[in-house]
From Swiss-Prot:
Tetramer of two alpha and two beta chains. GO terms for molecular function: tryptophan synthase activity. The alpha subunit is responsible for the aldol cleavage of indoleglycerol phosphate to indole and glyceraldehyde 3-phosphate. InterPro entries: Aldolase_TIM (IPR013785), RibuloseP-bd_barrel (IPR011060), Trp_synthase_suA (IPR002028). Belongs to the TrpA family. HAMAP family: Trp_synth_alpha. Keywords: Amino-acid biosynthesis, Aromatic amino acid biosynthesis, Lyase, Tryptophan biosynthesis. GO terms for cellular component: cytosol. Pathway: Amino-acid biosynthesis; L-tryptophan biosynthesis; L-tryptophan from chorismate: step 5/5. This is Tryptophan synthase alpha chain. It is an enzyme of class 4 (lyase). Pfam families: Trp_syntA.
């Protein structure tokens, strides 16, 4: 059982829902991320999604795009992201970390760091750093059988996005390769957009669960405790990203972790 599976299993036994915050690695300061991750765990995070900065993030809204641009300006690449996870793991051996990003940097890392025909350098190094899963936004499920198998061989899960526009055929494809959990994008468009229709989410989840036998997390548009509580009643996990980025972006360095901690504590309290 992977660390992600174990976390969801434990939460289910307790009758609780997973709280999954997203932050961009290296934002708002290049060296604050491990400390920020610890602060989020102390605030009630069960799994952390760590964004890998990329210059052309097509699925990200303006808030997360801007965070990625700032991280890139600090020189944050995949080598630095893995080092952040490694530092986090020196004190936290239990909280799952999922890397979220795009195929291009991963493929460039493999070329640069000597991937073989049957091995991915990035998967190998991510496993060594203590990563638990990956969500590669632009990897279609039908092309991920080998990638998923390589991740599983290193004890990691492959997370996929589903959307209101996902067909039953697409859900069936995702079900064949997904593990850990799936992330239901509750709005059409990019991250941080629009307002969330809880009734529409509730109507969609049974359809997803007919195909997918892993937990379902819901994100995009969750900005406060009331919305998180409503989503927590129907989903297995609540994912929050853009709101956290907005809260921390203008904080002094010594307040970043505390601000994220306090916000997540409020969300955790509403979920429980």
């Amino acid at each position: 059982m992977s660390r992600i599976e174990s976390t969801f299993s434990s939460l289910k036994t307790q009758g609780r829902k997973a709280l999954i915050p997203y932050v961009t690695a290296g934002f708002p300061f290049a060296d604050v991320t491990p400390e920020l991750m610890h602060g989020m765990v102390a605030g009630g995070a069960d799994v952390i999604e760590l964004g890998m900065p990329f210059s052309d993030p097509s699925a990200d809204g303006p808030v997360i795009q801007k965070a990625g641009e700032k991280a890139l300006s600090f020189g944050i690449g995949l080598v630095q992201v893995l080092e952040m996870v490694r530092i986090f793991r020196t004190k936290d051996h239990t909280t799952p970390v999922v890397l979220m990003g795009y195929a291009n940097p991963v493929e460039r890392y493999d070329i640069k760091h000597g991937a073989g025909a049957s091995e991915s350098a990035f998967i190998r190094d991510a496993a060594a750093a203590g990563v638990d899963g990956m969500l590669i936004v632009d990897y279609p499920p039908e092309e991920c059988v080998e990638f998923s198998a390589r991740l599983k061989a290193h004890g990691m899960d492959l997370i996929f996005l589903l959307a209101p526009t996902s067909t039953d055929a697409r859900m069936a494809q995702v079900a064949q390769v997904a593990s850990g959990y799936v992330y239901y994008v509750s709005l059409k468009g990019v991250t941080g957009a629009g307002t969330l229709d809880v009734d529409a989410v509730e109507a969609m989840l049974p359809r997803i669960r007919r195909h997918v036998n892993v937990p379902v997390g819901v994100g995009f548009g969750i900005r406060d405790a009331a919305t998180a509580k409503a989503i927590g009643k129907v989903a297995d996990a609540v994912v929050i990203g853009s709101k956290i980025i907005q809260l921390i972006e203008n904080q002094p360095r010594d307040r970043v972790a505390a601000v994220a901690h306090d916000f997540l504590k409020e969300i955790r309290s509403a979920l429980d």
